[in-house]
Each structure stands twice: as C-alpha cells, then as structure tokens.
Amino acid sequence: MKIFGTDGVRGKAGVKLTPMFVMRLGIAAGLYFKKHSQTNKILIGKDTRKSGYMVENALVSALTSIGYNVIQIGPMPTPAIAFLTEDMRCDAGIMISASHNPFEDNGIKFFNSYGYKLKEEEEKAIEEIFHDEELLHSSYKVGESIGSAKRIDDVIGRYIVHLKHSFPKHLNLQSLRIVLDTANGAAYKVAPVVFSELGADVLVINDEPNGCNINEQCGALHPNQLSQEVKKYRADLGFAFDGDADRLVVVDNLGNIVHGDKLLGVLGVYQKSKNALSSQAIVATSMSNLALKEYLKSQDLELKHCAIGDKFVSECMRLNKANFGGEQSGHIIFSDYAKTGDGLVCALQVSALVLESKQASSVALNPFELYPQNLVNLNVQKKPPLESLKGYSALLKELDQLEIRHLIRYSGTENKLRILLEAKDEKLLESKMQELKEFFEGHLC
C-alpha cells in the first residue's frame, strides 16, 4: 500500500490519520533515520490545527519507544522546520500540517538532517518498514534506552534572525505599509515580528487561530479579504500565507493579486540584477505560463521545467545548479536561504525588489502579459487512470490540433482532478474547458 503522496502523508484526521496509523508511521520513519543517525534527535513542529496535538503525541510516543529523543517546538512554518532541523543538528525533522487543506485534514512531512524533503526512494524505504510487522514489533526499547521528549518554546528567535539575514542589509522597510494575512496558521507569530523589526508599518489579519479556522476563507487560497484590506489601508503591499507558510500570494498597492508566474519572472530578473543567481537557469513546473519562458529568454535566462511539487522544483534546481525556482501556486524557493518554499523569505525579497525599483508595486510586479490560462479543480469520487477513460485520447488530440496547451492530472493530496488549459484565444479556451468539465464529470463524479 502506498502511503506517501506528492507532499508527505496527508488525510483526514481520525480517518486515515488515526493515532495507530501515525504511531506505526512514526516507528517506521524513526527506524529508517536510525540507519544514519548522528545525534539521536528528531525535531517536531506543527501548524495550528486542533488535530495537531493528537498527531504530535502519537509521533512522540512512537519515536521515544524506539529510543529517539524528541524536540517539540510547537506551531512553526514548514520552512522553519527545514531550517531548524539542520541548525539544531537533528537526524530528521517532522512537520505536522496539511498545508492549504481544510482544518479537518492533517499531514506529516519529513525532512532529512540537511533540511531537505525526502526523495521518493527514501519514502519507499519507510513504506517497506511500515509493512514489516516483525521489524516493527522487535524494535521497542526498554528501561534507560527509551527516548525522552522536551518542549522548547524559544527557537522562534533563531528562525527570525535567519529570515532577517535574507533581507538586504542596506535596506529597511520603514517606507512601506504592509498587510499580512497569516491564514490563522503557522506564520501567525513569526510574520508580524519579522516585518515590524525591519521597520514596516504592519497590519495583520487572520492571526487568531482556534484550531478550526486555519485557511478558512483566508490566506493564500482566499486572498480577496487581503485585497480589500490593502485598498482600505492604502498599503504598498499585501502578503497572504497558507496554513504552513511555505506558500505566498502577493497583492499589489491597487489590490490586484499578482500572478505566480509574474512573481517568478520579476524575482528571477531581480536576482540576476544583483548577480545573485548561481546559473542562468530558473526552475518552474510544467504548469507555468508560456509567457514566463518567453520573458526570461528576453532577459537571457533559461527556464527549466520539472514535475509539480516543490520537492521536485528543489531537486531540479540542484541538478541544474540553480538557486532560484518555484511554482505558479506560490511555492518559491531561494535556496541560498531555504531548502524548501518559504513564504516569508519570498515576501522579504518581493519587498526589497519594490523598494529598489522605486516604483509602485502594481508597476514593479507586472513585467509582462500572460497568455490566457484556465485552471479548474474538479471534485472527483474516483481516480481511475485517465488513459482508461473512453474518449480521453481523442479529446487530447483535438486540443493539440487547436494548439491548446493542456495539463490534466489528479491531485496528489486531495480527491480532485486539476485541469489546466492555455491558449491565445480566450473564448476558445473557455469553450473547451466547459467540454472537458462535462466529460470528466460524466466519468469521475
């Protein structure tokens, strides 16, 4: 049975993520990390979901039962776990979060001792241990060999210092008015402190988590409230994070939501202007708009494509010796400062770009026009191979003949089918999207 999806393990708390399942997974992961253990320490952080307590306690029980010492640091962004795992010299880091999913869901992400997400072969090795009954039941420690657990509440300071070091030393934010939407999630403590300490005039919204309101009509998936607040407050910029703050959505001074591909383009060129790029390559996923590739080419930069998921972006960056890349969805990686997408690092770089441009953000963050794109997330009841659907191949052939770029795939974390179409003719795009929706609704819903 496959346990891992495209971003760790994710499911409904109490249904897939039961205490028994989590304990078994924790033991399996712990035994895998034991093979290369240096410090016998594992770090655990979480977002603000109510079920995080249940999942955390199950993981602590599992890991200590096989002799690991566990450090619990409470609600922190996913990129903070990646950073602190290496910084605190732990064998591994674990983030308990379902990212942008509703509060009923939760998930578990693993990081190696260097702060990188696990490769697929590492996840498969953990899955093999998970299914090995004899190994699991023979691994419990007794007496003094049982591990310990301790909670540390002040590591947030380490991460704040790290974030501030990513911001250019010759700049400050005193001239900027910024609205932050922390999605009632993991960034609710750290984001306001970072921007305030760098001098910004800050307004914070959705920073009162109650365990059930994470991502609820707020944050990166629902930036309309942020847009309204930016206009009302006459702010220069607005930043919306998702539940675990590895994703960023930017709103300009006019209240417009800045497209993720425009962000990638303008930030890439900004990094080039500072001689901060390690190569001429910038990495993005197959969902990126063709206009991004054309814009980067005009700036003597090359776009490299990879599979969808920030861990694939990170891997492609390493293969191409690139230090900048990301996803249209707002997972943007500055690998000089973060091993994974970091919404706060990205927000600080956007702020620096706007400051140095000496332009309004609505101008500075709008470097090129996009080709019309249409993305639909369709709720599905089943996930058969798309190639097995009668008429599917003919649909794709027709799209190719009409020169409509297409990307159709199941979500790796939700019961959804993602349909992306791109073409120069917007009316044709809308017509074909409606046809596709009706086709898949008839087969999958």
Curated annotation (Swiss-Prot):
Cofactor(s) needed for function: Mg(2+)
Record's keyword annotation contains NADP: no
Assigned GO CC terms: cytosol
E.C. number(s) listed in UniProt: 5.4.2.10
Phosphoserine found at: S99
Record-level Gene Ontology MF annotations: magnesium ion binding; phosphoglucosamine mutase activity; phosphomannomutase activity
Annotated residues for binding of Mg(2+): S99, D242, D244, D246
Residues annotated as catalytic: S99
Function summary: Catalyzes the conversion of glucosamine-6-phosphate to glucosamine-1-phosphate.
Name recorded for this polypeptide: Phosphoglucosamine mutase
UniProt source species: Helicobacter pylori (strain G27)
Source taxonomy: Bacteria, Pseudomonadati, Campylobacterota, Epsilonproteobacteria, Campylobacterales
